[in-house]
Amino acid sequence: MKSVRYLIGLFTFIACYYLLPISTRLLWQPDETRYAEISREMLASGDWIVPHLLGLRYFEKPIAGYWINSIGQWLFGANNFGVRAGVIFATLLTAALVTWFTLRLWRNKRLALLATVIYLSLFIVYAIGTYAVLDPFIAFWLVAGMCSFWLAMQAQTWKGKSAGFLLLGITCGMGVMTKGFLALAVPVLSVLPWVATQKRWKDLFIYGWLAVISCVLTVLPWGLAIAQREPDFWHYFFWVEHIQRFALDDAQHRAPFWYYLPVIIAGSLPWLGLLPGALYAGWKNRKHSATVYLLSWTIMPLLFFSVAKGKLPTYILSCFAPLAMLMAHYALLAAKNNPLALRINGWINIAFGVTGIIATFVVSPWGPMNTPVWQTFESYKVFCAWSIFSLWAFFGWYTLTNVEKTWPFAALCPLGLALLVGFSIPDRVMEGKHPQFFVEMTQESLQPSRYILTDSVGVAAGLAWSLQRDDIIMYRQTGELKYGLNYPDAKGRFVSGDEFANWLNQHRQEGIITLVLSVDRDEDINSLAIPPADVIDRQERLVLIQYRPK
């Protein structure tokens, strides 16, 4: 009976966090709009080999993540939930692997359930796991690969070991097809310390080639297909997207070595109080094979990405699966022996909630700021933000009422965030970061446009997805579409600022021409170097400028 209650509680938890509130949040640009539009175009064109964005070749990532996203939109429609369905599914599958692996290590159902709940409620997991990017997919394949390797190394027969390594190769292959060759480097680095300390080199060398073969066979069909269709794909993807992105001096998203320290601290909420103890307990019990495996799995990818020049918070998502298991194991021991860390965790959550309440007041219309984040007419959004932090503080307090028993309720600290964040985004943010909001405000003007031009790839993708058209033209800036625009068949998909007046004269009689520009808040749109327009509609950071046939 208790198991049934636990399952009902888990499914209710998942529904409140990962299902019910998702449609209330508009898509963010540039990431969510980009991946939404790539998958929409894949479904519309039926081309499941070559990824396209705005009808242009888009070689920044391989294909597998787009497949899953496309299936999500195919099943649930071209809506906010459909766009995010793939990442939510991947996150829940990863949580299922956390459950299975914890059971495999400790044979404790309560511990497995707690590890799962901790994982799903970690701030970084929830933030990325409900956000339409490719990182939850690669995190799933990496976690699946680590589970497969453990399964192989614990097997007692050659059949079991062979099956485990074959499965490892498949997960690595799918990882390569999702985000590239990092799916090979990260698992290898993660297992090496464990293999070395356990002296398991023999099994690795005897059976490792099976993983290599299954990985190659997994990638080969699509790899050959895209090489035949687009011979330049692999050169661009390997050199630009791997070497330049991570290693060279001009790497994308450059950041210092310590970049991930605040990411781990913030990402560990609402379980931050368990982080030091979980890592220390893991190190203290390093003679235990499973603990060494989890520690290595957590730390090695973190060190790898810290050394790399290019960094983003999403890169270390897979590290939080083993960390959640270590936290759950440590929390049960602490509840039984010394609940100090659990009390500290409760106070951290109270402090975070109270700080959020104060910060919300400071940036509200009634605070001391001359330019508040919310305007007076957005009062309900301020109250939503207050509710988010009030619930966080409340559940932090509740965990302290009987800490040995109530500490798991820290998982409910982000409940207000999950349910209300979509209702608390300020209009000034929505107008620049949510193209859907702009489209809703200007739908009647946009719909009949013969040509639409914009200077932002993220906005272009949002317009294309919302309007169900992939012929948006880039104006002045090419951004990440620069490579695709270099192909001969992309001629006419970019108009420079100097060419715009002539281009306008040539095409004006064909129908309404709409220009959507991103501007600074204090920028005078009358000073823009463009021909006089028939219509100008400014929505804070985005401006609709329209030219009608003469």
From Swiss-Prot:
Q: Which reaction is catalysed here?
A: 4-amino-4-deoxy-alpha-L-arabinopyranosyl di-trans,octa-cis-undecaprenyl phosphate + lipid IVA = lipid IIA + di-trans,octa-cis-undecaprenyl phosphate
Task: Tell me, in one coarse class, where this protein mainly resides.
Answer: membrane
**Does Lipid biosynthesis show up as a keyword for this record?**
yes
Highest taxon of the lineage:
Bacteria
UniProt entry keywords in alphabetical sequence: Cell inner membrane, Cell membrane, Glycosyltransferase, Lipid A biosynthesis, Lipid biosynthesis, Lipid metabolism, Lipopolysaccharide biosynthesis, Membrane, Transferase, Transmembrane, Transmembrane helix
| GO cellular component terms given for this protein | plasma membrane
List the GO biological process terms: lipid A biosynthetic process; lipopolysaccharide biosynthetic process; protein O-linked glycosylation; response to iron(III) ion
**Cell membrane among the record's keywords?**
yes
Q: Where in the cell? A: Cell inner membrane
Q: Where are the transmembrane segments?
A: 7-27, 81-101, 111-133, 137-154, 165-185, 204-224, 263-283, 288-308, 315-335, 346-366, 382-402, 406-426
Q: In which pathway does it act?
A: Lipopolysaccharide metabolism; 4-amino-4-deoxy-beta-L-arabinose-lipid A biosynthesis
Residue spans making up a coiled coil are: none
Topology term for the membrane: Multi-pass membrane protein
Q: Spell out the molecular function terms from Gene Ontology.
A: 4-amino-4-deoxy-L-arabinose transferase activity; mannosyltransferase activity
> EC no.?
2.4.2.43
Q: Which family does it belong to?
A: Belongs to the glycosyltransferase 83 family.
**Entry function:** Catalyzes the transfer of the L-Ara4N moiety of the glycolipid undecaprenyl phosphate-alpha-L-Ara4N to lipid A. The modified arabinose is attached to lipid A and is required for resistance to polymyxin and cationic antimicrobial peptides.
Q: What protein does this entry describe?
A: Undecaprenyl phosphate-alpha-4-amino-4-deoxy-L-arabinose arabinosyl transferase
Species name for this entry? Escherichia coli O45:K1 (strain S88 / ExPEC)
Q: What is the lineage of its organism?
A: Bacteria, Pseudomonadati, Pseudomonadota, Gammaproteobacteria, Enterobacterales
Name of the gene: arnT
